[in-house]
Structures are given as C-alpha cells and as structure tokens.
C-alpha cells in the first residue's frame, strides 16, 4: 500500500520578500502569416499559418481567431491518392492493402469494402467463426497529443482483422471476441484498487512540478508541460481553478479501474486508418510547417503503443494555507492518517484521522460538512460525474456508494488509461515519399513542442513556475505566494533569498560546418541575482545537419525532389539585425525562402520585416531597424541590485537601486524611465561603499500594556490582550458599565480613555466555559488526563499577570491576577476594586 506523504509548512526560519509589485497584464499577440503552402493536388486548397509573437500573461487576453487560413488554388501536381498500388490492391479511397486480404470474408478496406465487392465464390473464402471485436477496441487506435493530454482522431484501422482469426476470452462475459490485426496482445483482466492514492502538495507549484511531464525535443532542450487526464464528459484541465487570490495547499485523491490491457503491434505491421492515410498522402514533399502542423492538430504527436481500458478518478481539494497553518500536526496524527489511506472518507471506522477531519472541515469553505473539489474523471457514465465532485465528511458510506456507482459503469464505457506512447512519425508509411515525409513530420513535431517551451514566457515572481497553455503563459506559485505573477506574499525558509536564473529560448541553428550545426541559449529569463542559482544545463548544443540525410533520400526517391520545386542552392545564414532576430528561422535557407525578422523585448520593428533568399544566393533585405521603445538598465557593478528586476522598463516606470552585503549606496536610489527613453536622473557613477556598523540603539523596556514598535513603546490594542481577570468597568465619558478585563482596562487607559472599576454586581461577567487543554487561563491548568482545564492552587501560578486590589471577606489586599483567579475559580466571592495594587491606589 502506498504511504501518504504529508507535506506541511512547518519549521521554516526566515522570510524574504523577492517581489512586491504586480506585473502589468500582457495580451497575446499574433505574428505575421507565413507564405502560402504548395497547392494540394487532392483538396485544391493551400494553407498558411501564423505563430504567436507574444504569449498572454499576468491576466492578459488570449489570442483570438485561428492560426490557419485556407484558400482555393490551382494545383501544379496531381493527387497522390490517384496513383496506382503496383502489386498491391487499391481500395476505392486510394489506400493500398495486401492482395492476401482480398476476398477473405473481411472488409479490410475501411471506408468502402472494395476488397470484398467482386468476390464470386463466397463459399471458398476463408472463414472465422467470430467476427465480433472486443468492446471499445476502436479506442486503441486513436492519436494522442502529449502536450494537451487529449486523444485525437483515429490513426489505426481497428476494424481490420488482418486476415487472421485470433480470439480472446472475456472471462466474466463468458464470450469470445476476435482481435484486430493491429493488436499484438489483449487481456480481459479487471483490476479495481480499493486503496485510494493520495498526496498532499504545499502549493500549486509543487503539484504542477510533480505532475508535469519532462519532454525532450530533438534538440535535447528539456522543458515541462502540464499533461492531465481529459474526459469526454467535459472534465478537462482547467488552470483557472487554481485561484490566484490566495496561497493554497492541495490534497489530491485518485484511483483507477482497469477492465482490459492491450499492446499494439510494431509500426511496420500496423494498418493505418484511411482518414489518417489520406492526410499523410496530402502532405507536401517539401517541408511546410503549416501543412504538417495541421496534421498534428488533427491526429496528435503520438499513437498508443500499449495501455489499459478502464476509468481514472482524480479529485483536487484546495485548502487555504493560512487556515491549515493554524492546525498543529503531530507525528502520531500523520502516522494514523498515512496508515488509514484516507479510508475514513469512504468507510465508517472507529479509528479516525480526527485532526485531518478537522482540517478538511475548516478549510473546505463550503456548506456543512461537504468538501467540494475539482474532479478529473476519464471513463464511466456521465450521469455519475456530479457525485464525484464532493465528499460528505459525515457520510463515508454515501461517498463509497457514489464512487462504486461510477466504477461499476466503467466496464461499459471505458477510456484508455496508463498509456505508453510512440511518436506519430513512426506511422508514416505506404504513401508517396514516405521517408521524406517521416523526416519532416519529426521536424514539425519538434517545432511544435518548442512552441510550448516556457522560455517564451516572462519570469514569474518569487520563483514561480511558468508553463505555456494554449496562447497563455500561466504562473504556478510556491508556498505562501499568490497572484497572477506570484507577486503576492513571501518566500519562506530555505527558499528565501535571491532570484534563480531561467533559460531563454534557443537561438536559431547556425550554418552547417563539417556536417554539424550549433545553437546557443542564455540564462537570462530571468538572470540569477542576489545569490540565486544559475540555470542547469548547457548553454550550447551541436547536432548533425539534415542536409546529408536529405541528399541520401534524394538518391533513393528522386521523384520526391522535383527540380521545378526543389532548389539545389541555399543561402548562408541571414544577416543579423541589431537588437533583433529571425523568427522561426529553420535549419536551411533554399532559394526563394522567406524569413521574418522581429525585435527583442523593449524594441519595435520599423520597416519591412520580410527577407528573401534570392537566385544569386544573396539575401534581399528591405530597410528595417529596431527602434527602442523602453528604457534598459546599464550593466551594474557586482553587489548592486535593481527592484523590480526586468529586461526593460516602459515610460513612467521606476526602478530602485540598492546594495547588498551591508554596504551603502552613494548617489540617488530611484530612477524614472522618461519620455525620451532615458533614465532620470542618469544612471551613472552608482557604487556601493562599506558603511560603518551603526550603534545598536538601546531597546526601551515597555509596560505590560505596551508593545515595542519602531524602537519605541506604544499602547497595545485591546484584542492583543491574552488571558486576564474579568472586571466591570465604567466609561466615565458615557457612564456605561460593561464587562472588560484588567489588561484591556490598562490598554484603554494607556490610549487616553477614562475607565474606572465598578462593583461586580453592576454588570454580568462572561460565564467560565469549559476549555480544552492548550487554551487554559492563567489560574487553570490541564488535568492529569490532559483533556480539560481545572483550577490551579495559588502556589502553582506560573504567570502572575497584573497586580490588582481585591476585596476578600470585606478586606482589601493586593493579589496577582492568577491568585485572584484561583480564588474565583474555587468558588470564593471576590471583588476587584482596583486594577493596580491597593497601596498604589491608596497613594
């Protein structure tokens, strides 16, 4: 059984505020459209695509509209699906299948059944006594987008048996099913886990970092993306549930139900779905990211190598960190909770995790004892999903019944879970120019993954993690921080300190030199400062050029490189643009290729951004330059810090300069970005000097009704009083008599209010209520069993409190609050006649 790890915020020492001001919202901005693709000979259309120039962040708007545009055109080449199949059989759709599948009694042409249309002798056909495939077998043939965690359109033909008669026994169903030719192994084995896996995360940052998947593009540049379960019933990943107004801890409960397990065949033996095969046929044999990206949008980045059919249940409960902090969790409480596996939520038991139940009730922010969470459910009947979004802390049996109803519906409506994936480009086959298209699809998937690299995002404050989701950058905050940019709150403990560095995006690939090319990146998003950690990884990367592989394919498949369309000459790398760079540069620059320039942050491009590789192998570049639109700080000496630390500052923004290490700043500390895009005052000759240690000021000794603030004693507030003896007090201004405490009277008199002690019979003091151990007043202590507060003896007073004048049996005497409280606790009738010692009042 999986042990529970409770990640609670305890034992932190020190706090450090890294950022304090919110970042302005950044709206998403589209870039310019790329050139139109080659005209598709099958659909007689061409497409073009625009990429995102600026990702939305810090609460800014998403990009509106489609990234693609399509228009009709006149093709210069025919449709590949109209070509012949050689020695193979051609379906009406144009797809080619083995002749051994013709007239075998099965419709192996997925859409039209052409392979069985002209079979005269039906009795001589091979026969299988079972034609019924396993339930929901079509789920095993879908594509999968590894970035979004969503299943896409069908890529495998799960209806074809491949001319084989392989059967599998269902077990509980007492029936036999015939396996698809694409299935290597299929097992009916129901697995229901009665123990719920559960984890605590001390922040949304910790949850996303734990559940994110680390991906590598071909460039070996690693980055994280958030991949969550998606459901056909609408419970999909929605980051808006991770509210930005507070810091939250997360409790995650999850479980799975398995119905069957499957393994698909090796790629070379898989039969493709006709719709997917057609799209592969339509792909151009010249690299055009727009065309290949459209295929990725429709069919995903991977297909299923193996997995299980079943259901997946996960619910996330958000707990206000400030409320959780009020509860003291002992090691014994944690041990009980860990051993219970949270079964107390689903099964009635005498041994309950009491402390945990109290925490859940306190932080639920919901009515009664209903703990509402955010469910992520895959599989099962949609009618049961609403009941999975909450838990009734007083009705474990009801919780179990609702979960069991959903789990019981999973065998009838399963989804794929626990999937293992293979890249989609491994399925590029049985189409013209398959080797070339396979290479280009691999390149397009790498380019697609790079679009979602967090390097496109601006830094989150306080060490938050940025992820790309659609056209937005989302910040996930560390413990005790919150806000759209994680700008609110403080970092705690060993996380307090400087700003850790983050990688910027890779540069474009350099030219091929001896069959290799190189690119680089910088650790400046943000740059490490104030002792923060530097980036982990390499600053440069080298890999083999694709040119040699393309030249080899040109020899094997020369028809895929028509001379009229494929240039044999290439331009060198495009000229550099000061304060700018080439957008989506690519690896090679054939004659006729257009590229687009853009400017780095803080600059705007003026002029024509498009350049073209000419016939003379020279770049045709128009007049353009990057115009400064913001202020940039000059390089500062070591030990000088800027706040806020940003790559550039817009007009009207201020930056504050400070020194670290106990040194003092010479010169102005605040600078304004003026309308002339210069700093006012000018940032020059700023330096830090060692300052003499200041004399430690004498700390004044405050009265009990005072507190130390800014090196001087000031009056406390009444609510800051702790346990104190109750008295009746007269407000000499309004003549009202009201119940107060000795401490509160001292505080009010300190603030200039005139209160005097009145007789005890003049007001009703609050009745002494039974209190649990831990909150006993001065004159009480915990009993031997440690369950409730009982009266102390006068000699047992540990904290005396104020000295007051008390009348006992008609005689006034000076006592401490604790001594007087002991007498009152033991039933003696006493009356407080003054809030100071009797002798002092007499004087």
Swiss-Prot record:
What is stated as this protein's family in its record?
Belongs to the complement C6/C7/C8/C9 family.
Instruction: Cite the residue spans of the region called CCP 1.
Output: 545-615
Q: Which Gene3D superfamilies match?
A: 3.30.60.30, Complement Module, domain 1, Low-density Lipoprotein Receptor, Thrombospondin type-1 (TSP1) repeat
High-level lineage: Eukaryota, Metazoa, Chordata, Craniata, Vertebrata
**Species annotation:** Bos taurus
* Coiled-coil ranges from the UniProt annotation: none
**Region annotated Disordered, chain positions:** 114-135, 517-537
Q: What is this protein called?
A: Complement component C7
- Localization (cell): Secreted; Target cell membrane
Q: Which GO terms describe its cellular component?
A: extracellular space; membrane attack complex
Q: Region CCP 2: which residues?
A: 616-693
Biological processes, Gene Ontology terms? complement activation; complement activation, alternative pathway; complement activation, classical pathway; killing of cells of another organism
Q: Which domain of life is it from?
A: Eukaryota
Biased composition regions of type Basic and acidic residues, renumbered to the chain: 121-133
- Residue ranges of every copy of the TSP type-1 domain listed in the record: 27-80, 500-549
The MACPF domain covers which part of the protein? Answer: 124-456
Sushi domain location: 569-628, 629-690
Assembly: Monomer or dimer; as a C5b-7 complex it can also form multimeric rosettes. Component of the membrane attack complex (MAC), composed of complement C5b, C6, C7, C8A, C8B, C8G and multiple copies of the pore-forming subunit C9.
């Amino acid at each position: 059984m999986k042990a529970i790890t409770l990640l609670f915020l305890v034992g932190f020492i020190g706090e450090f505020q890294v950022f304090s001001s919110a970042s302005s919202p950044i709206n998403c901005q589209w870039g310019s459209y790329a050139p139109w693709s080659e005209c598709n000979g099958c659909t007689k259309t061409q497409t073009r695509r625009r990429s995102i120039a600026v990702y939305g962040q810090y609460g800014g708007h998403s990009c509106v509209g489609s990234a693609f545009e399509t228009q009709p055109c006149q093709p210069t080449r025919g449709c590949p699906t109209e070509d012949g199949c050689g020695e193979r059989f051609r379906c009406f759709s144009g797809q080619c299948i083995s002749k051994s599948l013709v007239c075998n009694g099965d419709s192996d042409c997925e859409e039209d059944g052409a392979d069985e249309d002209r079979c005269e002798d039906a009795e001589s056909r091979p026969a299988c006594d079972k034609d019924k495939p396993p339930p929901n077998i079509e789920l095993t043939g879908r594509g999968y987008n590894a970035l979004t965690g969503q299943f896409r359109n069908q890529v495998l033909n799960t209806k074809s048996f491949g001319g084989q008669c392989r059967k599998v026994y269902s077990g509980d169903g007492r029936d036999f099913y015939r396996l698809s030719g694409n299935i290597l192994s299929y097992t009916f084995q129901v697995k229901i886990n009665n123990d719920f896996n559960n984890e605590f995360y001390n922040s949304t940052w910790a949850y996303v970092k734990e559940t994110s998947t680390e991906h590598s593009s071909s460039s070996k540049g690693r980055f994280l993306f958030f991949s969550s379960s998606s459901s056909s019933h609408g419970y999909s990943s929605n980051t808006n549930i991770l509210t930005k107004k507070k810091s939250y801890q997360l409790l995650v409960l999850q479980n799975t139900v398995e119905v069957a397990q499957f393994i698909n065949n090796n790629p070379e033996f898989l039969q493709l779905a006709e719709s997917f095969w057609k799209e592969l046929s339509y792909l151009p044999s010249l690299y055009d990211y727009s065309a290949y990206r459209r295929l990725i949008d429709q069919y995903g980045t991977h297909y299923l190598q193996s997995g299980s059919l079943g259901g997946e249940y996960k619910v996330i409960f958000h707990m206000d960190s400030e409320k959780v902090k009020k509860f003291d969790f002992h090691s014994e409480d944690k041990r009980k909770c860990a051993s219970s596996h949270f079964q107390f939520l689903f099964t009635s038991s005498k041994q309950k995790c009491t402390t945990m139940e109290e925490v859940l009730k306190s932080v639920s922010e919901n009515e009664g004892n209903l703990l509402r969470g955010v469910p992520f459910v895959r599989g099962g009947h949609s009618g049961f999903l609403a009941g999975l979004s909450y838990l009734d802390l007083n009705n474990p049996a009801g919780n179990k019944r609702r979960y069991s109803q959903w789990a019981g519906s999973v065998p009838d409506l399963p989804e794929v879970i626990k999937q293992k994936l293979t890249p989609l480009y491994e399925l590029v086959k049985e189409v013209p120019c398959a080797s070339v298209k396979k290479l280009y699809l691999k390149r397009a998937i790498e380019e697609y993954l790079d679009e979602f690299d967090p390097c496109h995002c601006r830094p989150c404050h306080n060490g938050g993690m940025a992820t790309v989701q659609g056209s937005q950058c989302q910040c996930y905050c560390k413990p005790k921080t919150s806000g759209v940019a994680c700008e609110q709150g403080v970092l705690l403990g060993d996380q307090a300190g400087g700003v850790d560095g983050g990688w910027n995006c890779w540069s474009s690939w350099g030219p091929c030199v001896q069959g290799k090319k190189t690119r680089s990146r910088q650790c400046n998003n943000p740059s490490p400062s104030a002792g923060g950690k530097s980036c982990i990884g390499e600053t440069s990367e080298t890999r083999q050029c694709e040119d040699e592989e393309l030249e080899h394919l040109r020899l094997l498949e020369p028809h895929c490189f028509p001379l009229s369309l494929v240039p044999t000459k290439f331009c060198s790398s495009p000229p550099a643009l000061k304060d700018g760079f080439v957008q989506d540069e690519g690896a090679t620059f054939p004659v006729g290729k257009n590229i687009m320039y853009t400017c780095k942050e803080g600059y705007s491009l003026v002029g024509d951004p498009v350049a073209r590789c000419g016939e003379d192998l020279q770049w045709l570049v128009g007049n353009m330059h990057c115009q400064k639109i913001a202020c940039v700080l000059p390089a500062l000496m070591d030990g000088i810090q800027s706040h806020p630390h940003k790559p550039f500052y817009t007009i009207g923004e201020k930056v504050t300069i400070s020194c670290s290490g106990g040194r003092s700043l010479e010169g102005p500390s605040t600078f304004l970005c003026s309308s002339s895009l210069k700093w006012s005052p000018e940032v020059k000759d700023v330096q830090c000097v060692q300052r003499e240690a200041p004399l430690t000021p004498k700390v004044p000794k405050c009265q009990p009704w005072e507190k130390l603030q800014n090196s001087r004693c000031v009056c406390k507030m009444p609510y800051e009083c702790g346990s104190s003896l109750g008295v009746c007090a007269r407000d000499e201004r309004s003549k009202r008599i009201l119940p107060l405490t000795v401490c509160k009277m001292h505080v009010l008199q300190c603030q200039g209010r005139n209160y005097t002690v009145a007789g005890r019979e003049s007001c009703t003091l609050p009745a002494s209520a039974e209190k649990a151990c831990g909150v006993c007043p001065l004159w009480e202590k915990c009993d031997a069993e440690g369950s409730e507060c009982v009266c102390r003896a006068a000699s047992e007073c540990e904290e005396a409190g104020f000295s007051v004048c008390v009348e006992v049996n008609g005689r006034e005497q000076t006592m401490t609050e604790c001594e007087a409280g002991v007498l009152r606790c033991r039933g003696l009738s006493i009356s407080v006649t003054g809030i100071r010692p009797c002798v002092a009042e007499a004087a």
